Amino acid sequence: MSKDDLIQFTGTILELLPNATFRVKLENDHGIIAHTSGRMRKNRIRILLGDKVTVEMTPYDLTKGRVIHRH
């Protein structure tokens, strides 16, 4: 799967879960579970409750995603 196949959405952090995982509400009112990307972990970027984030998802599983940017 190439990077072109990934879908990006904007959402809001609703809940902080263990192991750098978050419950995110997308702009289209869908809820997903997302984890932080490796680059965000490496640079120790903190994500807090209520933050606006960009989530990257695969078209094969629309219930899981990866947080790639914090606004």
Curated annotation (Swiss-Prot):
Keywords: Cytoplasm, Initiation factor, Protein biosynthesis, RNA-binding, rRNA-binding. It comes from Rickettsia akari (strain Hartford). PANTHER family: TRANSLATION INITIATION FACTOR IF-1, CHLOROPLASTIC (PTHR33370:SF1). The lineage of its organism: Bacteria, Pseudomonadati, Pseudomonadota, Alphaproteobacteria, Rickettsiales. Component of the 30S ribosomal translation pre-initiation complex which assembles on the 30S ribosome in the order IF-2 and IF-3, IF-1 and N-formylmethionyl-tRNA(fMet); mRNA recruitment can occur at any time during PIC assembly. It comes from the Bacteria. This is Translation initiation factor IF-1. InterPro entries: NA-bd_OB-fold, RNA-binding_domain_S1_IF1, TIF_IF1. One of the essential components for the initiation of protein synthesis. Stabilizes the binding of IF-2 and IF-3 on the 30S subunit to which N-formylmethionyl-tRNA(fMet) subsequently binds. Helps modulate mRNA selection, yielding the 30S pre-initiation complex (PIC). Upon addition of the 50S ribosomal subunit IF-1, IF-2 and IF-3 are released leaving the mature 70S translation initiation complex. GO terms for cellular component: cytosol.
